[in-house]
């Protein structure tokens, strides 16, 4: 049971959780109430850094949600890497209670990664997409070689973005590529000529919820995998 618990916690949380448990032990040595406070904090850290297994729909034509949260906006904007190109931006807001592990939205190849320094205003605000610290990955899909862009965006509390993806890496939809600590936002930029199934206000699950289809989806049968 302990092994399963550790397996379902993201490695970025190990040190923080160990420190919080150590503080709870010290707290109990000082007073019961102080120990309880640190113990509750430890349990909250475990909850925050949880990394549950997901049932990922399989198919190179699928665009899967890269994060848990709620869709704030779906709008046509200029591409963040090419102002002359219009793309569709789906913005997902993650509150502190959401799973913060981020997943690859489409099978393909990582063409570029970029760290962009910035501010730490509330991730629920649209201007955070342009002003806040963020980490970008650019994916070329296996189907039709579409360009899909994912931005991990820091929020008011989130000050730590982790991205393990690297240029030239072959990736599969649903696999983990990073995490953003505490409240944050993830933007995914898609080509206009695809079939959108997501809608504003929708609650999405990273690695499970289908946001869009790259091709004639009604003629393709879906299967799933556990990741």
From Swiss-Prot:
Modified residues (Pyruvic acid (Ser)): 184
Origin superkingdom: Bacteria
Catalytic activity: a 1,2-diacyl-sn-glycero-3-phospho-L-serine + H(+) = a 1,2-diacyl-sn-glycero-3-phosphoethanolamine + CO2
Main location group: membrane
Keywords assigned: Cell membrane, Decarboxylase, Lipid biosynthesis, Lipid metabolism, Lyase, Membrane, Phospholipid biosynthesis, Phospholipid metabolism, Pyruvate, Zymogen
Name of one Pfam family that matches: PS_Dcarbxylase
GO biological process, one term: phosphatidylethanolamine biosynthetic process
Pathway: Phospholipid metabolism; phosphatidylethanolamine biosynthesis; phosphatidylethanolamine from CDP-diacylglycerol: step 2/2
Site label Cleavage (non-hydrolytic), positions: 183-184
Catalytic residues in the record: 184
Protein's cellular compartments: Cell membrane
Record's bilayer topology term: Peripheral membrane protein
GO cellular component: plasma membrane
Family, per entry: Belongs to the phosphatidylserine decarboxylase family. PSD-A subfamily.
Protein name as it appears in the record: Phosphatidylserine decarboxylase proenzyme
Lineage: Bacteria, Pseudomonadati, Pseudomonadota, Alphaproteobacteria, Rickettsiales
Record gene name: psd
């Amino acid at each position: 049971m302990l092994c399963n618990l550790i397996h379902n916690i993201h490695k970025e949380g190990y040190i923080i959780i160990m420190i919080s448990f150590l503080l709870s032990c010290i707290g109990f040595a000082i007073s019961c109430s102080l120990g309880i406070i640190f113990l509750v904090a430890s349990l909250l850290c475990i909850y925050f850094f949880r990394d549950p297994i997901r049932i990922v729909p399989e198919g190179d034509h699928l665009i899967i949600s890269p994060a848990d949260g709620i869709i704030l906006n779906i709008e046509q904007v200029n591409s963040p890497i090419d102002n002359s190109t219009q793309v569709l931006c789906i913005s997902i807001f993650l509150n502190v209670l959401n799973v913060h592990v981020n997943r690859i939205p489409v099978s393909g190849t990582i063409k570029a990664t970029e760290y962009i320094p910035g501010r730490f205003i509330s991730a629920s605000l649209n201007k955070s997409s342009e002003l806040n610290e963020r980490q970008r990955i650019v994916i070329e899909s296996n189907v039709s070689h579409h360009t899909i862009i994912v931005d991990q965006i820091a929020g008011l509390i989130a000050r730590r973005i982790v991205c393990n993806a690297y240029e030239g890496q072959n990736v599969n939809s649903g696999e983990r590529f990073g995490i953003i600590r505490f409240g944050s936002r993830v933007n995914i930029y898609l080509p206009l000529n695809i079939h959108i199934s997501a809608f504003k206000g929708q609650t999405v699950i990273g690695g499970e919820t289908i946001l869009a289809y790259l091709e004639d989806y009604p003629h393709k049968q879906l299967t799933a995998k556990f990741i």
